[in-house]
């Protein structure tokens, strides 16, 4: 035992989590620094980050705390929220998440730490689950094609609107008609999306007002926000006769009993899958859906899972029709959506599979029966029910009693929806019991006696009209009719997760994606009732805890970035970009400079940048990059001068997408400002800056951050995400507003998310991470991320050229290696290397972005030296295999790279390859101790798009 007595502070270990989060320990850091030839961490940082942007002081954040203390503080936030019985409805409902799904999907790192399935061979489990979602949505809506989720119902409606405008070539109108009984938050989002695109939104009664307008599409709510169920067949027929398209926003549970939109003639169906087992989460994250006719499939926004075949001709899943998406088509994409809501879509699909069609119908019939009992009881108590035909919602005329009834409900810890001064709304859900109905009746009866539920049940009548009762079957596929016992569901989920690679098994070195640790303590509070059982439109005095946490998180993010104000409403990075550009646009308009509509974007930018710019009505002008990957200052000056009178903004990622800190970033910002433009710093790479420099201090006017990158929200296999925007003081008045937020700034832009605080349910994750790390820990994490990236670059440089470095030879938090020469030397492609990495148990780095034919590697700070070396060993071994091809040991078409990934079926099948089975499946000896087997061989992408199938294939194909 040492003679030195430790201090009490040392024994308390308040900074212990920092060492849990950061992979390399001090000895490993020293070894890596020695390998780089630098004396210490500060020397490395000074050679990497330009001195002109370094901050001189530490972050103004509380010191680090223990995991137990963070959870205790979070519990205090949660206890300040009030969990009432909520009947507000408006697209959000209480639901019962089956615990087998809660534990084995939402709380399982095998699912929530996975990345978007761009590498399909190692994503077969979640691709199958998402295909189940698409099949379920297609069946329920009666449509031919559904995508793999959108961000929320309001966004889905806005996407459907712009989709109709794209595909409806017969109609040149710029009017979009919205039924007045659509969800209010949907109407707000649609109006906000329409305005910069020059679309006029008309809200009215479609039965009366539609004939008075020339319109290109109509949006109808089914059932309406106040509960009304209407037959829209004739109205849709009339729209079609006018060459207009029809969108129906349909409640997913009601479609088990109601005639589906497709059978009513709708062209597009949208909605929210939240009530299929996903908690309220104070408004999100939830998986919206969009479904349409086959003829419009190439105009669908978002991700689309399709069925293809692998190299052996066996069935395999992949993302289909990717040429629609922003990462390929940029400003010509169908949408700027990148991250969607994969994890929540998977949860909803498993809820559907667990209950099956009969179970879902039983739930729906129970909800409807209880609603009819409530309506009958209200009538017998002397209340007038305004809703004649309904599914789960009624509006009640309360006249002069409105306030009294509403307050009486609150006294009983019941939330009703206040429609207006004379009307209250009640929406029932899966969690409602007969006792709940009795309690509601007592509230509305105002002390008068009410009949008991059993008596009312005998006289209550079905409120769905005969002509709208669903006759068609749905969810007939075996996957929805097999896994109804917990044992079967548990094993199905395990089988699927075993097919995939996620952070629970391996490092995911995706450049520009920041696949860092999602710590268990950070994830724990997400499923607490105090956070997950709060309705987004609950009275503000019931959400004090959430709003205090949100305000504190905004303060933390401001401290980290140097921005004056934040909005946490954007529920994806793409939405943050969109909101930030809208704020810039509104700022210019407020100054009488509304004609500023040119957005300068470097050629190296992420595809969401130009896609977002076109969504706000801006014209994209590309700026060249120089040979070192930096913004070409001469070309920037030229373009800024050419467009000076109309320059709205520059969008620049920092550090650059080429993986370096551009030393001229202050000059870049200055050039744009000199010509009246605003500077948008894309925060995708903030993981290289926290604690070292602040975009709000070196020239940025606005940035979006990716909380699902830098601040530890998991990627979920393609969502959820949060993309908050930080702004300088002059842009603060133009942050997104929302009618449910209480007071909103006069100049606030329209909401860009359906819920006032977006995906609020996952904000505790980022708060917890920042709280446990403190300013000191966050800074150390940034330094370690830079160290890890430079170590990988150093180890790989003798084998692969590192394409870009800073002026002193170092990279930021990621590096790009050039594999293009191999195509010329021996025919090996970047795809071959990516697939071969699967045999080594790794997800490939980012392929062909931002430079075609390259790999961009980002290890993050969470990976240990052992894992970094394991990856480097794999890459070096692959280089030796390439050299063997170059030396003529075997040709590329018969090489391990060409046949990768190797499956267990390959191993036991006929082997006619010039290399051994062991070389194919165990290229390194260490793999024998822990081997990941790809469930499929290399997938044929061309076949999948030419033979597009985006629903579950028949079970005979599983058997084969």
Swiss-Prot record:
Coiled coil: none annotated. InterPro entries: GcvP, GDC-P_C, GDC-P_N, GDC_P, PyrdxlP-dep_Trfase, PyrdxlP-dep_Trfase_major, PyrdxlP-dep_Trfase_small. GO terms for molecular function: glycine binding; glycine dehydrogenase (decarboxylating) activity; pyridoxal phosphate binding. It comes from the Bacteria. Its cofactor is pyridoxal 5'-phosphate. Gene3D superfamilies: Aspartate Aminotransferase, domain 1, Type I PLP-dependent aspartate aminotransferase-like (Major domain). It holds the Pfam family GDC-P. The modification N6-(pyridoxal phosphate)lysine is found at residue 709. It is an enzyme of class 1 (oxidoreductase). Keywords: Oxidoreductase, Pyridoxal phosphate. It catalyses: N(6)-[(R)-lipoyl]-L-lysyl-[glycine-cleavage complex H protein] + glycine + H(+) = N(6)-[(R)-S(8)-aminomethyldihydrolipoyl]-L-lysyl-[glycine-cleavage complex H protein] + CO2. GO terms for cellular component: cytosol; glycine cleavage complex. Transmembrane segments: none annotated. Its EC number is 1.4.4.2. The glycine cleavage system is composed of four proteins: P, T, L and H. NCBIfam families: gcvP (TIGR00461), PRK00451.1 (NF001696), PRK04366.1 (NF003346). The glycine cleavage system catalyzes the degradation of glycine. The P protein binds the alpha-amino group of glycine through its pyridoxal phosphate cofactor; CO(2) is released and the remaining methylamine moiety is then transferred to the lipoamide cofactor of the H protein. Belongs to the GcvP family. PANTHER family: GLYCINE DEHYDROGENASE (DECARBOXYLATING), MITOCHONDRIAL, GLYCINE DEHYDROGENASE, DECARBOXYLATING. This is Glycine dehydrogenase (decarboxylating). It comes from Hahella chejuensis (strain KCTC 2396). The gene is gcvP.
């Amino acid at each position: 035992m040492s003679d030195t007595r430790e201090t009490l502070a040392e024994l308390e270990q308040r900074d212990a989590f920092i060492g849990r989060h950061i992979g390399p320990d001090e000895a490993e850091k020293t070894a890596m620094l020695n390998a780089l030839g630098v004396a210490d961490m500060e020397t490395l940082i000074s050679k990497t980050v330009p001195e002109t942007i370094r901050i001189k002081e530490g972050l103004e954040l509380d010191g680090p705390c223990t995991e137990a203390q963070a959870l205790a503080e979070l519990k205090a936030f949660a206890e300040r929220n009030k969990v009432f019985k909520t009947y507000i409805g408006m697209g959000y409902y209480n639901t019962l998440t089956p615990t087998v799904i809660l534990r084995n999907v939402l709380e399982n790192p095998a699912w929530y730490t996975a990345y978007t399935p761009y590498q399909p061979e190692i994503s077969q489990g979640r691709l199958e689950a998402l295909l189940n979602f698409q099949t379920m949505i297609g069946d329920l809506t009666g449509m031919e094609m559904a995508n793999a989720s959108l961000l929320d119902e309001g966004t889905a409606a806005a996407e459907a609107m712009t989709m109709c405008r794209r595909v409806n070539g017969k109609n040149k109108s710029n009017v979009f008609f919205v039924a007045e009984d659509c969800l209010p938050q949907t109407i707000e989002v649609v109006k906000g999306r329409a305005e910069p695109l020059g679309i006029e939104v008309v809200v009215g009664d479609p039965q009366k007002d539609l004939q008075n307008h020339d319109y290109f599409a109509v949006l109808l709510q089914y059932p309406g926000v106040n509960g009304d169920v209407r037959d829209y067949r004739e109205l849709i027929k009339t729209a079609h006769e006018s060459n207009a398209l029809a969108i129906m926003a349909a409640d997913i549970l009601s479609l088990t009993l109601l005639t589906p939109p497709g059978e009513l003639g709708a062209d597009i169906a949208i909605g929210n899958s939240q009530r299929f087992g996903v908690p309220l989460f104070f408004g999100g994250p939830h998986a919206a859906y969009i479904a349409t006719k086959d003829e419009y499939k190439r105009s669908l926004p978002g991700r689309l899972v399709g069925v293809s075949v692998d190299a052996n001709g066996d069935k395999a899943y992949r993302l289909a029709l990717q040429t629609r998406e922003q990462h390929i088509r940029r400003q010509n994409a169908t949408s700027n959506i990148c991250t969607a809501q994969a994890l929540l879509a998977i949860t909803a699909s498993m809820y559907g599979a667990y209950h099956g069609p009969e179970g879902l119908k039983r739930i729906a019939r129970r909800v409807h029966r209880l609603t009819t009992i409530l309506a009958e009881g209200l009538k017998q108590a002397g209340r007038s029910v305004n809703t004649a035909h309904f599914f789960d919602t009624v509006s009640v005329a309360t006249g002069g009693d409105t306030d009294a009834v509403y307050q009486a409900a609150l006294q009983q810890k019941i939330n009703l929806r206040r429609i207006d001064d004379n009307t209250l709304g009640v929406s029932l859900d899966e969690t409602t019991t007969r006792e709940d109905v009795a309690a509601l009746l007592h509230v509305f009866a105002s002390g008068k006696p009410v009949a008991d539920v059993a008596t009312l049940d005998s006289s209550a009548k079905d409120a769905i009209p005969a002509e709208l009762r669903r006759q068609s079957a749905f969810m007939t596929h075996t996957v929805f009719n097999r896994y109804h016992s917990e044992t079967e569901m548990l094993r199905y989920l395990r089988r699927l997760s075993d097919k995939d690679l996620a952070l629970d098994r391996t490092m995911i070195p995706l450049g520009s994606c920041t696949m860092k640790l999602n710590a268990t303590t950070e994830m724990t509070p997400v499923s607490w009732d105090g956070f997950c059982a709060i309705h987004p439109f609950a009275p503000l005095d019931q959400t004090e805890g959430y709003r205090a946490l949100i305000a504190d998180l905004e303060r933390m993010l401001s401290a980290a970035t140097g921005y004056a104000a934040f909005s946490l409403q954007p529920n994806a990075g793409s939405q943050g970009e969109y909101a930030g550009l809208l704020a810039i646009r509104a700022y210019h308009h407020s100054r009488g400079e509304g004609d500023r509509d040119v957005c300068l974007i470097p050629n190296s930018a992420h595809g969401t940048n130009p896609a977002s710019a076109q969504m706000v009505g801006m014209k994209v002008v590309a700026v060249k990059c120089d040979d070192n990957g930096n913004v070409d200052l001469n070309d920037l000056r030229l373009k800024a001068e050419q467009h000076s009178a109309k320059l709205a903004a520059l969008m620049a990622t920092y550090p650059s997408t080429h993986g370096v800190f551009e030393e001229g970033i202050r000059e870049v910002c200055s050039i744009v400002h000199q010509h009246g433009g605003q500077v948008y710093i894309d925060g995708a790479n903030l993981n290289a800056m926290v604690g070292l420099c602040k975009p709000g201090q070196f020239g940025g006017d606005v940035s979006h951050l990716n909380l699902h990158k830098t601040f530890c929200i998991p990627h979920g296999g393609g969502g959820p995400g949060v993309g908050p925007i930080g702004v300088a003081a002059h842009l603060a008045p133009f942050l997104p507003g929302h009618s449910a937020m209480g007071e909103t700034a006069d100049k606030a832009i329209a909401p860009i998310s359906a819920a006032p605080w977006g995906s609020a349910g996952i904000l505790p994750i980022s708060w917890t991470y920042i709280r446990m790390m403190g300013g000191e820990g966050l800074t150390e994490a940034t330094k370690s991320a830079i160290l890890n990236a430079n170590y990988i670059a150093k180890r790989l440089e003798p084998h692969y050229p590192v394409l870009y470095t800073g002026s002193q030879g170092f990279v930021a938090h990621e590096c790009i290696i050039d594999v293009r020469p191999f195509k010329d030397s021996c025919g090996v492609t970047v795809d071959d290397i990516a697939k071969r990495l699967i045999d080594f148990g790794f997800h490939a780095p980012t392929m062909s972005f931002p430079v075609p034919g390259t790999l961009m590697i980002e290890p993050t700070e969470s990976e240990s030296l052992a894992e970094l070396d394991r990856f480097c060993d794999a890459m070096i071994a692959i280089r030796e295999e390439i050299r063997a091809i170059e030396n003529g040991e075997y040709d590329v078409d018969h090489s391990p790279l060409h046949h990768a990934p190797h499956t267990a079926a390959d191993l036991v099948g006929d082997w006619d390859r010039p290399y051994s089975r062991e070389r194919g499946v165990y290229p390194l000896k260490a793999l024998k101790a822990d081997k990941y087997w790809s469930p499929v061989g290399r997938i044929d992408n061309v076949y999948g798009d030419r033979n597009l199938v985006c629903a579950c294939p028949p079970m005979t194909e599983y058997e084969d």
